């Protein structure tokens, strides 16, 4: 068995990140494809802007994928997606999203007093 290496995502690993998501992350035919693990770190307004951009690209799965990918590229370059890539030799084979709790807009909600 090959040794697995774990590396924190950084802009210099952008190519590996997208190679993983474009070619291996959903090779099982998952209904979640396309995904770049970025929507969790986006506000509702940012997601709506991404949807609008997808419509400008012609809509459908291709418009959505292009908009989603462009948004993810920008987020990786600015350090807004944080996590770890797993490598088998030089090939990215796994991903773990590990951002700050407050950056998971869909999950983090301040406690409400009842």
Regions found by a protein language model. Name each.
Residues 34-82:
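Active-site rim helix/loop that mediates acceptor-substrate recognition in acyltransferases
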Residues 13-16, 65-67, 108-113:
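Short amphipathic alpha-helical surface micro-motifs
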Residues 19, 23, 34-38, 42, ...:
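Intrinsically disordered, low-complexity regions enriched in small/polar residues
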Residues 70-81, 87, 91-114:
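Conserved acyl-donor/pantetheine-binding loop and adjacent beta-alpha core of acyl/acetyltransferases
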Residues 4-6, 14, 84, 95-98:
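Broad hydrophobic/π-residue packing in well-ordered secondary structure
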Residues 1-54:
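Conserved N-terminal entry element of GNAT/NAT acetyltransferase domains
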